[in-house]
Structures are given as C-alpha cells and as structure tokens.
C-alpha cells in the first residue's frame, strides 16, 4: 500500500494540474480584461504598486451600492487603500437614466480628479432617495454643492459624447466581464457579486496580500 500511494498521488496531481493551470490562465485573462483601459478614464485611488486591486461596478441609484459606499468603503480606505495595500477603481454601471445622469455629473465635477469625483458620488449616495424622486433638482443641488453653476450642470448633462462613452464601457462590462448587477466587484480579477460587510471583504483581501 505504501508503495502505491505516491504513485496514486502523483497520478491525481497529473490529472488535477491541467484544470488548475486552465483556471489560473482563465483568471489571468479576466484580470487583464478588467484592467483594460476603457473609453472613460478610470476613477482610481491608492498606490499603483498595491498588491491588490479592487474594481467596483456601481450605480448611483443602487441602494446596496450606497450602503457599501457609506458603511464599508470608509473602513476599506483607511485600513487598506490609504496604507498602500489596495488600489481601488470605481466604474459606473448605471441601471437607469437617472444613474447615468448622476454619473455624468460626477465626471464633470471630478474633471479628471478621482477624489473630487468620489466626493460627488458620496454626496449623491447620501441623497439617493431624493435623486430618485427629484432627479433634476437633486443634480442641480449636487452640482452647486461642488462649485458648478446651473449653466455648468445643464451643459454637462448635454454632453452626448460622455454618454456614448459611458454606454460603451457598460456594454464592455456586460459582454466581456459578465457584469449583470450592482454592485459587482473584481478582486485581482476574481468576480464577486453583491455587497458585503467589511469583515467579509477583508477575509477576501487577506489571502491576496500574502501571494
């Protein structure tokens, strides 16, 4: 029996290796697809040298996205992003025209600055119920809170090129990354659907930091 065990174990390894290799290759391909530059520049914070990259697909009108942004993201940021361990990428996946309009406004407010963009997102998540009920008035309010005039907001929302890019990036997420709902996360290319408490997210992060 002792003689055959190593042989049997070796045979099992031989059988398992192709699937393990295939899985690793597939995971690498997904990670590359997630990291691919899109039509709109990524909203990213944290060190580019971080071991872990978390990409979130979010909608401004998604209650679970707002809950994550308000309850989980601050802890993620203080413990992992600001310490250089995690790079966080925020991507829009608007579930409706109201979310799309809010995303476009955040882009205008940010104007290439990820921190300003995320500050606008934070404001809109806090006002999510109002955004859903009184979209135009809420967008005007948020714009003014972030230094824009009424004319600036109106001009921003008429930028068809931005809407087209937003749509193209969402189609890529659906077709290539199989994103179908929000929030959807990719942790170094591993897809995780749905919001989660900080403790669960941390348990997913820790093994990636050790690799």
Task: Briefly describe each language-model feature range.
Residues 64, 97-98, 165, 193:
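Secondary-structure boundary/capping motif
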Residues 2-5, 22-31, 59, 141-211:
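C-terminal cap of thioredoxin/glutaredoxin-like
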Residues 2-94, 167-175, 207-211:
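Extracytoplasmic thiol/disulfide redox context detector
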Residues 38-40, 126, 187:
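Residue-level signal for pocket-adjacent positions within structured domains
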Residues 13-14, 72, 124-127, 146, ...:
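Alpha-helix boundary/capping residues
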Residues 60, 66-144:
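Structural alpha/beta surface segment adjacent to cysteine/selenocysteine redox centers
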Residues 51-52, 115, 180:
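Structural motif
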């Amino acid at each position: 029996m002792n003689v055959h065990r190593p042989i049997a174990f070796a045979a099992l390894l031989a059988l398992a290796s192709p699937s393990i290799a295939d899985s690793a290759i597939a995971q690498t391909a997904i990670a590359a697809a997630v990291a691919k530059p899109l039509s709109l520049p990524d909203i990213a914070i944290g060190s580019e040298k971080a071991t872990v990259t978390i990409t979130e697909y979010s909608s401004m009108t998604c209650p679970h996205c707002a809950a994550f942004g308000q309850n989980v993201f601050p802890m993620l940021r203080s413990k992992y992003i600001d310490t250089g361990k995690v790079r966080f990428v925020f991507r829009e996946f608007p579930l409706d025209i109201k979310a799309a309009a809010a995303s476009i406004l955040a882009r205008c407010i940010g104007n290439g600055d990820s921190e300003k963009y995320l500050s606008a997102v934070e404001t809109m998540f806090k006002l999510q119920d109002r955004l859903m009920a009184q979209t135009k008035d809420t967008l005007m309010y948020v714009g003014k809170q972030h230094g824009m005039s009424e004319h600036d907001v109106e001009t921003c929302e008429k930028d068809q090129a931005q809407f087209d890019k937003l749509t193209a990036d969402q189609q890529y997420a659906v077709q290539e990354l199989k994103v179908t709902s929000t929030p959807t996360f990719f942790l170094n290319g591993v897809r995780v659907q749905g919001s989660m408490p900080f403790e669960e997210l941390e348990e997913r992060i820790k093994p990636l930091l050790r690799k």
